Amino acid sequence: MPLATTLGTLVLLLLLPLPRGAEVTGDHSNVALDYGALEGEEGTEQQLHYHDPCKAAVFWGDIALDEDDLKLFHIDKAEDWTKPSIDKPGHDTGGLEETSARWPNDTASNASIQAPRKDGKDATTFLPNPGTSNTTAKTFSARVRRATTSRTERIWPGGVIPYVIGGNFTGTQRAIFKQAMRHWEKHTCVTFVERTDEESFIVFSYRTCGCCSYVGRRGGGPQAISIGKNCDKFGIVAHELGHVVGFWHEHTRPDRDQHVTIIRENIQPGQEYNFLKMEAGEVSSLGETYDFDSIMHYARNTFSRGVFLDTILPRRDDNGVRPTIGQRVRLSQGDIAQARKLYKCPACGETLQDTTGNFSAPGFPNGYPSYSHCVWRISVTPGEKIILNFTSMDLFKSRLCWYDYVEIRDGYWRKAPLLGRFCGDKIPESLVSSDSRLWVEFRSSSSSLGKGFFAVYEAMCGGDITKDAGQIQSPNYPDDYRPSKECVWRITVPDGFHVGLTFQSFEIERHDSCAYDYLEIRDGPTEDSTLIGHFCGYEKPEAVKSSANRLWVKFVSDGSINKAGFAANFFKEVDECSWPDHGGCEQRCVNTLGSYTCACDPGYELAADKKTCEVACGGFITKLNGTITSPGWPKEYPTNKNCVWQVVAPVQYRISLQFEAFELEGNDVCKYDFVEVRSGLSPDAKLHGKFCGSETPEVITSQSNNMRVEFKSDNTVSKRGFRAHFFSDKDECAKDNGGCQQECVNTFGSYLCRCRNGYRLHENGHDCKEAGCAYKISSAEGTLMSPNWPDKYPSRKECTWNISSTAGHRVKITFSEFEIEQHQECAYDHLELYDGTDSLAPILGRFCGSKKPDPVVATGSSLFLRFYSDASVQRKGFQAVHSTECGGRLKAEVQTKELYSHAQFGDNNYPSQARCDWVIVAEDGYGVELIFRTFEVEEEADCGYDFMEAYDGYDSSAPRLGRFCGSGPLEEIYSAGDSLMIRFHTDDTINKKGFHARYTSTKFQDALHMRK
């Protein structure tokens, strides 16, 4: 059973073992509060001050303590940590034995405490082994006060846990979080509700420390539950929520040695603390037995030195079987029982989450017992309402229903508005909730008993909603919506406001015209109001804003395919920029859905208060040509500058930008200082490039008559900056596509027409007509496209591509887009790939449909592609990139063949970080002869940087014939058997020309092998 915290000790935060790939950083601060991104949906962030579980004053392995915890736990200078541990005799189980470490009075060896450093990096203080001394290490002692009084503030009042989901999570991740919360609600009396004005609540956030959470209610404001990299799995989130509810890890309970054995020698160094157990006074198991099946239990190999080494070994049961531990699928029966005890859930009642259901008084219709107490929590999809009908009612009748009664409240708990209290034998009228939850409570205290009651409920999707803000979701979200549903919501906000609607997630059966399942939105109160849009598919619709205070939303599903559906937030929207003070903005106010931002005119930038403007570099330019430079050119530019130039040319002109000098801080990432160039004047216009470093960008030409150039520097390193010249040229292609039938390419002072793949230019220079499309390609890399890409390919078309690469390098095809008429056997339109020079070679695959094929790699230096379309359906086609991969299996024959170190040998030096293995195989009875024509590889005394190795066999386990680097001719290399392996390795710095060799098969098998 997971350890529920004793009410007096719910104070620690617990960092969980991370899943594979999760990142951990040591960015710990002395302040356990952080500013996190928060929002109602993706994309619109605000700042929230919350307790950050990744920032702690002291770390004990995976347990972190903040300043309040240090005071409560009396962390002092070293006392108990350095005392020799007292070993106790182990239990005879017939297996591995050890004396489990006690927390905090003794510790495993090499344990460590992580304390914060000013530079944000890990600072680890290693605790000395018992009996050793370490005068330089700063050590700590933890003396935990036993729980002597209750601390009820650590339990969530009424079992209600308000939550907020941070703005950096996707719709899929949000759905997982909600599924995990509904799972806890389904089996316990804990309730998760979206936060309104509650002071204490949890915030789902993406933190660098991976998966972690406080244990129980922290109090004093919001607290984060970190769902970091690779943590967004249902079981992991449910586990984290277990900590929020108030559970420790199961294996740390005081009686764990009776059930599991800790194998200390298999634990990763420095992670021993994760296996310390607590004292009986520090936690309470509430009388529940040890639960191997708990979702809060570590797995057998958690924090193991190797994936197949056990760190926790369950003891055998009566049948000699070791129980399974570490499941992350669902709450165990023990988890459920303990949570119900911790939150004092009524023994009678349950959480009902189906769209229809029924419930009755205990013992119905044979009579209910005295002093019964039952609670039913009905929870359906947000945006739905609940219709509750009593079909039978027979309760002891009293004035004001004082003794026996059933009470219905319009919400999620006992303090929600009362819809009615009933007793006697009169059946109540139908009750309808105002939202998606109902609370039903039954109590009996009289000795005069009746039959009880029976009630049925049904979820009703859609309806009239009159409130400032809320949420609507497809029926059964986040699970698949149900077939044949029609839901209509009529949303009304106060007069003078607009309705704003933003989507958190969206997945509705896809169709070109949304003919099957769809979401329809209209600007007004009825189905005759102006249509805003019909939506389906998997892309979230843009945010919607009504023209008045009403919005009509309709969801329809047919009888077949069902998807996850949608979740959307609605709210009253006002244009803050229409206020007399324009939102406090000095120059320009930009209204956004649900908020607004201030902006400045060209030549100005926002000051630190984000409302006033100050003079800046950049400006608004209307000249046909000119020069722009970074601030201070040719001297170093200043720090913390943001300059925007908006260049505008006459209509039908295009603007070209040519950099004459360029030197900025940064590299390929460009996250410090950079120059951004866009077609258009807005900061979200089409991006041509983001540039930094010392490499001069290519000439950039705008797509319209506007160009935006933005320069930004951070607060550290400054460089010389840049100087660029811009000039404008009339774009003949801007009007009527220049008269070109397909593509028009603007050139300086003129233009030319061009045809798409599969077509050729007519003699008139403007029209295109179909042509054969058989291509021979010998370049190392490039792009392939179906005919007429990106429009639909023509019917009755056959195209071939014969791709050949440098000898010794395999051709690779990677698809970026793919859409060809679907057929189970690809009998109609299809793309075929062959492992050779023509269609007689072995076939690598035939593809059709809309799923992108995985990358295809030939076994040799040739690959043949054949595209075929029939006379009927046409689709968009495909776009792919061809490249090369080094290495592979080569066949040595009497005829001489070539081998090159890299595909662009002769044109470019070999690349960095190359790892190439070639296996050259001759026929039985023959050996391999390798003769180098050119050899130029970075030189080093031991050939430790770049090198070529030869092995007398199929792999690197064969005898090595030598490792080679430097320049100059090498002697011939002969194999003793029928195979020779060549390995080429390069590091990440100096690159040279490479090597060119010829190989052939030979009967000269007793030749001298070349010495290193």
Curated annotation (Swiss-Prot):
Record-annotated CUB domain positions: 348-460, 461-573, 617-729, 773-885, 886-1002
Compositional bias (Polar residues): 126-135
Keywords: Calcium, Cleavage on pair of basic residues, Developmental protein, Differentiation, Disulfide bond, EGF-like domain, Glycoprotein, Hydrolase, Metal-binding, Metalloprotease, Methylation, Protease, Repeat, Secreted, Signal, Zinc, Zymogen
GO CC aspect terms: extracellular region
InterPro entries: BMP_1/tolloid-like, CUB_dom, EGF-like_Ca-bd_dom, EGF-like_dom, EGF-type_Asp/Asn_hydroxyl_site, EGF_Ca-bd_CS, MetalloPept_cat_dom_sf, NOTCH1_EGF-like
Cofactors (names): Zn(2+)
Domain named EGF-like: residues: 573-614, 729-769
Disordered: region residues: 83-135
SUPFAM superfamilies reported for this sequence: EGF/Laminin, Metalloproteases ('zincins'), catalytic domain, Spermadhesin, CUB domain
Stored Pfam families: Astacin, CUB, EGF_CA, FXa_inhibition
Enzyme Commission numbers on file: 3.4.24.-
Cofactor binding note from Swiss-Prot or TrEMBL: Binds 1 zinc ion per subunit.
Disulfide bonds: C189-C345, C209-C231, C211-C212, C348-C374, C401-C423, C461-C487, C514-C536, C577-C589, C585-C598, C600-C613, C617-C643, C670-C692, C733-C744, C740-C753, C755-C768, C773-C799, C826-C848, C886-C916, C943-C965
Glycosylated position list: N168, N358, N389, N625, N802
Annotated binding of Zn(2+), by residue: H239, H243, H249
Root EC class: hydrolase
GO terms assigned for molecular function: calcium ion binding; metalloendopeptidase activity; zinc ion binding
One of the protein's GO biological processes: proteolysis
Record domain Peptidase M12A: where: 146-346
Signal peptide coordinates: 1-21
Propeptide cleavage-removed residue intervals: 22-146
PANTHER family according to UniProt: METALLOENDOPEPTIDASE, OVOCHYMASE-RELATED
Name of the protein this chain belongs to: Tolloid-like protein 2
